[in-house]
Amino acid sequence: MSFPNSSPAANTFLVDSLISACRSDSFYSSSASMYMPPPSADMGTYGMQTCGLLPSLAKREVNHQNMGMNVHPYIPQVDSWTDPNRSCRIEQPVTQQVPTCSFTTNIKEESNCCMYSDKRNKLISAEVPSYQRLVPEPCPVENPEVPVPGYFRLSQTYATGKTQEYNNSPEGSSTVMLQLNPRGAAKPQLSAAQLQMEKKMNEPANGQEPTKVSQVESPEAKGGLPEERSCLAEVSVSSPEVQEKESKEEIKSDTPTSNWLTAKSGRKKRCPYTKHQTLELEKEFLFNMYLTRERRLEISKSVNLTDRQVKIWFQNRRMKLKKMSRENRIRELTANLTFX
């Protein structure tokens, strides 16, 4: 890259020529500290004119000392960027200080302020000395604290309520954590409360589980229809095998290994059907999976069940068949696959 002359004014624009996106090859005069690209015949006016800041230069026009900056309404701060004596901006040193800002009186300030007070400002200024050149001092406001919007604000009722509720906490740092992080502050206390609840649930679980199970199952049997109660009576008289199965399940539930977390191994049915009833229903299901209302009424009379019970049995049987067919299909697919 060749420069026409090695004047100090030309050296000042070296950084600008490398950084600026609107500039290509160098063309500047030694008389005025001005830098513009040479206009070519193909592209016409090129360079800073596209930015809308400087007027274009015609060919062989060198005398542009009095050229000014056009200020447009969408860039109102252009005047403050440039020096009054120069028509183009020179890079300023890094140590330029940001002017101190002040809040206007017509802006509404929040009543509750940020938790970072004067102590926090002193700590920040002591810990980060490298930023003192850019931000020399905090903005002067009437209050020394910075106003924060409402969604960042700490609710004072939350803090006082939590500290009163958990007065027995030995650590004094919990209040500081509550101020800095209101969401995560109550986690240790909540975990302790959960542990106490689990202990209370675990202690009576081993001794009182069979009684709870009987109490839960008895209202289900009592709340059924009178026809279902008659069905229960018929089942208890006609099928002693079902009673033996239920007694075995109760014995299994009495073992100390089963607690309130684990469910029972077997499912106690509310109204199990007899062998004769299931046989007749299975025959009808093999003949036809879906029943009409007339056929359902006939079967319910012959098997001594209600219309609703027959309907529910067929629904469950269809779901069972669907599940079995799905499992068989999966088994066949996995059997055909060979894993190397």
UniProtKB/Swiss-Prot annotation:
GO terms for molecular function: DNA-binding transcription factor activity, RNA polymerase II-specific; RNA polymerase II cis-regulatory region sequence-specific DNA binding. Keywords: Developmental protein, DNA-binding, Homeobox, Nucleus, Phosphoprotein, Transcription, Transcription regulation. Residues 202-268 are annotated as: Disordered. CDD domains: homeodomain. InterPro entries: HD, HD_metazoa, Homeobox_CS, Homeodomain-like_sf, HXA10/ABDB-like. GO terms for cellular component: nucleus. Residues 242-253 have a biased composition (Basic and acidic residues). It is found in: Nucleus. Residues 266-325 bind DNA. The modification Phosphoserine is found at residues 238-239. Residues 208-217 have a biased composition (Polar residues). It comes from the Eukaryota. It holds the Pfam family Homeodomain. Sequence-specific transcription factor which is part of a developmental regulatory system that provides cells with specific positional identities on the anterior-posterior axis. Belongs to the Abd-B homeobox family. This is Homeobox protein Hox-D10. It comes from Saguinus labiatus (Red-chested mustached tamarin).
